[in-house]
């Protein structure tokens, strides 16, 4: 793991809209716009290449026996909310779900996560992803958006108290609408286009960035965003309070005005499943911003959340308390959270 390049306590949280709250977690309400989805994950005990003939792709018709299968609770809104709750936050997912939501509802209720922002459409299914992985870790994925196609019927303008928010991947119209409504209310929020990148053109991206408080993408998405908008990293950064770019196992970079904070990756004890690490990172970042942490600390908190997630299968199966998180943070980065 790369060593911390700068003492976190020495740098201010430029662009923060929140007062620093030392001591135990200061609970603030965070609205999480995005999807709640089921992830059905299957493992094919062979290699796809042994069953697909390259010269017969025009008549592709294959079937794979998958003796191993598991169903996980997922979706960006669900994953972020789950991780934020672990830290002691108060997440409110805003999402559209379908007639089969009951098991997920019970899971959220058991976690103590509020569901008054979740709207159920009984004539549709909850969004779901079907992933088949072979022994080379190649994947064939099918995604059914289901009720997510009606997510624009959820209006964040009607939520009575919102301290902070994130607009994560969701239905196209819902994302445009939620950005507009948060901006109109003056609510600070993170714009997280993620897998929804193909849904928007350059004009739409430029408009959403200019209305956002923060923007977060991974390194590949950052290149796409620059291509679509015609803006380079510095130009995007000057339009928001912070522009965060994650680089997987290489850490992340937080651009704040003319400042650049290189965030080292946290150490993981074992690598089990990277799925959902980005959502865990976002939860850690949101929690740190709401606590008024400086950017180097915020980035490290986010990085540690991602590392703790990678040690477990699925996206919502890790368990720890804030005290355990804070102790691990001190062990890894050499200083204590206030």
List each language-model region with its residue ranges.
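Intrinsic disorder/low-complexity segments
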Residues: 1-26
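Glycine-rich phosphate/adenosyl-contacting loop at the front of the ribokinase-like
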Residues: 20, 26-92, 103, 336-338
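Active-site metal-binding loops of divalent metal-dependent hydrolases
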Residues: 36, 170, 280
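A glycine-rich beta-to-alpha transition motif near the start of alpha/beta enzyme domains, typified by
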Residues: 90-116
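Beta-strand->loop->alpha-helix junctions that form or flank phosphate-binding loops
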Residues: 94-99, 116-126, 241-247
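Conserved phosphate-binding/catalytic loop of the ribokinase/pfkB sugar-kinase fold
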Residues: 116-121, 129-173
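Conserved phosphate/ATP/ADP-binding segment of small-molecule kinases
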Residues: 177, 183-190, 194-264, 270
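Conserved phosphate-binding/catalytic region of the ribokinase-like
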Residues: 230-338
């Amino acid at each position: 793991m790369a060593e911390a390049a700068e003492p976190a306590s020495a740098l201010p949280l430029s662009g923060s809209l929140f007062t620093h709250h030392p001591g135990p977690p200061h609970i603030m309400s965070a609205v999480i716009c995005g999807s709640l989805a089921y992830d059905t994950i299957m493992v094919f005990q062979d290699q796809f290449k042994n069953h697909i003939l390259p010269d017969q792709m025009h008549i592709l018709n294959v079937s794979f026996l998958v003796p191993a299968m598991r169903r996980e609770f997922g979706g960006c809104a669900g994953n972020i909310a789950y991780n934020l709750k672990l830290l002691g936050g108060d997440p409110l997912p805003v999402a559209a779900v379908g007639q089969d939501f009951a098991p997920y509802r019970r899971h959220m209720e058991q976690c103590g996560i509020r569901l008054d922002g979740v709207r159920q459409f009984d004539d549709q299914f909850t969004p779901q992803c079907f992933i088949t992985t072979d022994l080379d870790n190649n994947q064939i994925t099918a995604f059914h958006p289901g009720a997510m196609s009606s997510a624009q019927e959820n209006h964040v303008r009607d939520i009575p108290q919102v301290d902070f928010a994130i607009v994560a991947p969701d239905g196209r119209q819902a994302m445009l609408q939620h950005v507009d409504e948060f901006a109109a209310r003056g609510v600070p929020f993170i714009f997280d286009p993620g897998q929804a990148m193909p849904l928007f053109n350059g004009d739409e991206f430029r408009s959403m960035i200019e209305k956002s408080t923060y923007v977060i993408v991974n390194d590949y998405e950052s290149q796409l965003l620059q291509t679509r908008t015609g803006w380079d990293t510095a130009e995007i950064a000057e339009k928001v309070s912070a522009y965060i770019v994650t680089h997987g196992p290489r850490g992340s970079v937080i651009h704040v005005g003319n400042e650049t904070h290189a965030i080292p990756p946290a150490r993981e004890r074992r690598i089990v499943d990277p799925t959902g690490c980005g959502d865990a990172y976002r939860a850690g970042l949101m929690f740190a911003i709401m606590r008024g942490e400086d950017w180097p600390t915020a980035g490290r908190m986010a990085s540690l959340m991602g590392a703790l997630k990678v040690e477990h299968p699925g996206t919502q199966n890790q368990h720890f308390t804030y005290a355990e998180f804070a102790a691990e943070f001190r062990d890894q980065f050499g200083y204590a959270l206030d």
